Swiss-Prot record:
It comes from Desulfurococcus mucosus. The keyword ATP-binding does not apply. Residues 15-22 are annotated as: G1. Keywords: Cytoplasm, Elongation factor, GTP-binding, Hydrolase, Magnesium, Metal-binding, Nucleotide-binding, Protein biosynthesis. One of its GO terms (cellular component) is cytoplasm. This is Elongation factor 1-alpha. Residues 154-157 are annotated as: G4. It holds the Pfam family GTP-eEF1A_C. It is found in: Cytoplasm. GO terms for molecular function: GTP binding; GTPase activity; translation elongation factor activity. GTP hydrolase that promotes the GTP-dependent binding of aminoacyl-tRNA to the A-site of ribosomes during protein biosynthesis. InterPro entries: EFTu-like_2, G_TR_CS, GTP-eEF1A_C, P-loop_NTPase, Small_GTP-bd, T_Tr_GTP-bd_dom, TRAFAC_GTPase_members, Transl_B-barrel_sf. Residues 195-197 are annotated as: G5.
Length: 438
């Protein structure tokens, strides 16, 4: 018998571009022995030659992911490491503006987030500006239901003077206030002063910051908690990709949100209403008999063809099939808009793995963010900062669920003009009639 496995957690690394997310992740993996010396030497020489030595750890990460894009981490990449207590999968969320929707699909799979902020003068402030991704990513993480947060205050070696306790306290106060406003319990959030480049306070404590007596980053990871698995709810698996594998057949890939999937089960793919039987299930190239919430799986199905299912579909139980919305009512927060939003506005809604344009058919009420009470019925328009109850009509078939029933399928982001316009939670659904083709 193999030793019992450590519990598994998915973690997303978020924060403003160039604040050090990839360097921090690469350095942690390097220190935990995940790279062979040959690769390290090669990358060191390469980065020195190009005069970009400070990219060394980030490049190690890129090499590992085989994506040496022009200094920008694009697709979501999955990496694993273990601590004393847990087995982690890191979802390295890209930091550039136009990748927020990757961040949305990535964040919806995470149990916890590390928010990386730069302590360097001007850089922290840029991340907290109206256009800043520190703000945007924190708001998204909160909406996506990530309740556990670790803040890494990076580049402490580059403050004025270096390792400044005053600067650390200033950032902790500004960011703490902001996170509290989002509904986070700030007393539970560690704010860890680090240098991703020198490795200080990643694994061992830094002698340069004797004023700090909290946990190192890796110690803080071990204080995270495994969220309870919603195994008693009906099965829901948002589909990320579908493959046709020779000798096996059709293999949809996705993460189990709720319920349990077993070999031999019959399930239904919505919105198409197609029924299939599960032949095999795999996770990380290992065959398993059943999959539970949090498992990233590929499962071979009989009874459907690759062309019948696509990213954004949801596989679910036949008894309680996933809901296809004719219309849905949601509470939204407008994060950014240059003018105003009125009835008829049609942003793209990103929910679980789907992205579908949805038209606002009614603005029911404006809400006071502090009390949650209604302050205006049927306002003519909404502007940046407003919270409101609105009705949406999807332009094409879309699976959504009430946030109170299935969190991962009931929270969404609204995108337009390459930006995140707002975020929301589904309150009520008027279901569309779908014939299930048994």
């Amino acid at each position: 018998m193999s030793a019992p496995q450590k519990p598994h957690l998915n973690i997303v690394i978020i924060g403003h571009v160039d604040h050090g997310k990839s360097t921090m992740t690469g350095h942690i993996l390097y220190r935990l022995g995940y790279f062979d010396e040959k690769t390290v030497k090669m990358i060191e020489e390469e980065s020195k030659k190009m005069g970009k030595e400070s990219f060394k750890f980030a490049w190690l990460l890129d090499r590992m992911k085989e994506e040496r894009e022009r200094g920008v981490t694009i697709s979501l990449s999955y990496m694993k490491f273990e601590t004393k207590k847990y087995f982690f999968t890191i979802i390295d969320a890209p930091g550039h503006r136009d990748f927020v929707k990757n961040m949305i699909t990535g964040a919806s799979q995470a149990d916890a987030a590390i928010l990386v902020v730069s302590a360097r003068k001007g850089e922290f402030e840029a991340g907290m500006s109206a256009e800043g991704q520190t703000r945007e990513h924190a708001i998204l993480a909160r909406t996506m239901g990530i309740n556990q947060l670790i803040v890494a205050i990076n580049k402490m070696d580059a403050t004025e003077p270096p390792y400044s306790e005053k600067r650390y306290n200033e950032i902790k106060e500004i960011l703490g206030k902001f996170l509290k406003g989002l509904g986070y319990d700030v007393s539970k959030i560690p704010f860890i002063p680090i240098s991703a480049w020198t490795g200080e306070n990643l694994i061992e404590r830094s002698p340069n910051m004797p004023w700090y007596n909290g946990p190192t980053l890796v110690e803080a990871l071990d204080t995270l908690e495994v969220p309870p698995k919603p195994i008693n709810k009906p099965l829901r698996i948002p589909i990320q990709d579908v493959y046709n594998i020779s000798g096996i057949g059709v293999v949809p890939v996705g993460r189990v949100e709720t319920g349990v999937l077993k070999v031999g089960d019959k399930l239904v793919f919505m919105p198409a209403g197609l029924v299939a039987e599960v032949k095999t299930i795999e996770t990380h190239h290992t065959k398993i008999e059943k999959a539970e919430p949090g498992d990233n799986i590929g499962f071979n199905v009989k009874g459907v063809e690759k062309k019948d299912i696509k990213r954004g579909d949801v596989a679910g139980s036949l008894d309680v099939p996933p809901t296809v919305a004719d219309e849905f009512t949601a509470r939204i927060m407008v994060m950014w808009h240059p003018t105003a939003i009125a009835v008829g506005y049609t942003p793209v809604i990103h929910v679980h793995t789907a992205s579908v344009a949805c038209r606002i058919t009614e603005i029911i009420a404006k809400i006071d963010p502090r009390t949650g009470k209604e302050i205006e019925k049927n306002p003519h328009f909404l502007k940046q900062g407003d919270i409101a109850i609105v009705k949406f009509k999807p332009i094409k078939p879309l699976v959504v669920e009430k946030y109170s029933d299935f969190q991962g399928l009931g929270r969404f982001a609204m995108r337009d003009m390459g930006k995140t316009i707002g975020i929301g939670q589904v309150l009520e659904i008027k279901p569309a009639q779908v014939n299930i083709k048994k």
